[in-house]
Amino acid sequence: MSGYGTSFALIVVLFILLIIVGTAFVGGY
């Protein structure tokens, strides 16, 4: 749970942030 778990969590967080920023950008502009 040291290598794969951390990498997977990081990818998920970045993916969620990307969706939030993308949605805000499309909706705001």
Curated annotation (Swiss-Prot):
Transmembrane intervals: 8-28
Keyword tags: Membrane, Transmembrane, Transmembrane helix
Record keyword Methyltransferase present: no
Keyword Transmembrane annotated: yes
Membrane topology: Single-pass membrane protein
One Gene Ontology cellular component: membrane
Compartment(s) where it occurs, according to its Swiss-Prot or TrEMBL record: Membrane
Record-stated family: Belongs to the SscA family.
Protein name as catalogued: Uncharacterized membrane protein YczM
Gene that specifies this protein: yczM
